[in-house]
């Protein structure tokens, strides 16, 4: 297959140069204007693959240098934004090529996997007998058990290990809360609508599908194809009017009816409702679980005897009214989240348990690596914190714990990386942000976010409610501190806002240092800033307010905690586990299985009588009761069919181990049975009375299968390879 990506790069750059010839891309002497097309590298040739990637890496590095220079020269923001858009386009091209060059055996057979998931009812589209609703899914017995085990392991790994305070908040959220958090104003995508039947589409997704269809037409010229490739490369960067122009230029119609479409409009992704019968209290289904934790900060602080640091967590469903859900569990309208908010003194971001994860080696994709065209590299976590790649050891500790959790539940370490947000991606209040990303058949997808959110959330809610959300820190010795506060000109504020002046003054009096510093910067740059309180907006200028800095002596210090927030998308984690653990038995393409770690396997063990002979039934009953007493979830399969066929059935739903009762169990004393390992298909023989505790210890991770094989004799009977496989 010919390499079209250098062409895509040139086309992207050309389109952007038309918008801003001065600053979009690096100077011509530093650009790759004619990188030759080359055949794709064979999976066995890493050198050949790197040759293909080298010019793309160079293109990213040069543009990253150019963006940095623009910022150093204090170029106009519009020029910086355009140059950053070009940088992101080059990054996407590089990453697409990296994924295209991965070995074929590294890619899961998604069609075969999805067939297994549907056939064994892991999950299915909700309301299927009514035609289904996109973006909503029901979990079947196997999927429900797998999801619950993923959640239970999360609880043990984080809440119990870290002694985190778990809470459970309502999903219904009044509008003012989400207005304060920014969700009402900013939580939106652009949408277009069929003008005749009202069918809605997400604008960027529809434009992408339409352009790809045009490009696949044999009559499409190379020039036109390059133009459309450049549009696709910067699709995430278009605003409302730019999208509207593109829909007109490319004559985009409804894909289902061919009707005209409305211009793109912002669509808020939250589900709106009204609380109470009067309809006077608008609200929303929560888009995240975090806000409930922030609002209960004071109560949680009291519960923790007023001490920092402490952490709170919540597991629950959140809702986003996606315009066009797709990609199975990756983009849905209702999903389960698990979020931790770790509250810490901003001046003491050192975690006492960081040494326990400091020696972990994991793939880190730093912001610097991204703007210089490098790939993620394996790095010791302790070195990453010491060298400042990761901002502080609290953030580093949670990244390490996240890595251990994800690999524990079945995500491949080689398909897991932590990507740092680039400066233009991070919210203005964030200190550092890293996403855990997994490689799937859909490419790299975010499954966990881990951000140092500074003091932003608590400060916002404190200003809106005029309730101080702070912790008191006793000082060993009195100290003199610098104080920053607003100094309002009451006369000017009163003249401008009259009866609302009191609202403005109260708001300014409740602001913390973080916010004041941000607004001070706006005052110096623009001469004004805007505040919002009790549903009203006020513009304040230099003659109305200034910033006063002075010193005072304190015996007790008030601290607005910084927040480290790990946020887990459990549906995406579950989907990644499904892909990373799906296998086809060597030599038998029809025999598939999931190699779930025992800790999350839907059933830890199966109990399988060799046949339906009634002599086996007392032992089936005895083992089932003993497994239940040991807390081992299990499945009894006493159906007809060969033992090999039943092994295949239990393997297909990821049952970790299998106990088989045969005639030796009945006829010999002491009574013994076989225990089979799903992944290796090897078996041992042990006394029936011992097996439940052995399976329990395997499921809890106290022992490994290697330990079991060292302790008990191997058995080779029920599954002897080729003959049994043929029978199945």
Curated annotation (Swiss-Prot):
Gene: Gars1
Protein name: Glycine--tRNA ligase
Keyword list, A-Z: Acetylation, Aminoacyl-tRNA synthetase, ATP-binding, Cell projection, Cytoplasm, Hydrolase, Ligase, Mitochondrion, Nucleotide-binding, Phosphoprotein, Protein biosynthesis, Secreted, Transferase, Transit peptide
Residues given in the record as glycine binding sites: 288, 339, 565-567
InterPro entries assigned to the protein according to its UniProt record, in alphabetical order: aa-tRNA-synt_IIb, aa-tRNA-synth_II, aa-tRNA-synth_II/BPL/LPL, Anticodon-bd, Anticodon-bd_dom_sf, Gly-tRNA_synthase/POLG2, GlyRS-like_core, tRNA-synt_gly
Record-listed Phosphotyrosine modification sites: 442
One cellular component (GO) term of this entry: secretory granule
Domain WHEP-TRS: 52-108
Known function: Catalyzes the ATP-dependent ligation of glycine to the 3'-end of its cognate tRNA, via the formation of an aminoacyl-adenylate intermediate (Gly-AMP). Also produces diadenosine tetraphosphate (Ap4A), a universal pleiotropic signaling molecule needed for cell regulation pathways, by direct condensation of 2 ATPs. Thereby, may play a special role in Ap4A homeostasis.
Major localisation: cytoplasm
Known partners and oligomeric status: Homodimer.
GO molecular function ontology, one term from the record: protein dimerization activity
Species, as recorded: Rattus norvegicus (Rat)
Similarity comment text for this entry: Belongs to the class-II aminoacyl-tRNA synthetase family.
Alphabetized SUPFAM superfamilies for the sequence: Class II aaRS ABD-related, Class II aaRS and biotin synthetases, S15/NS1 RNA-binding domain
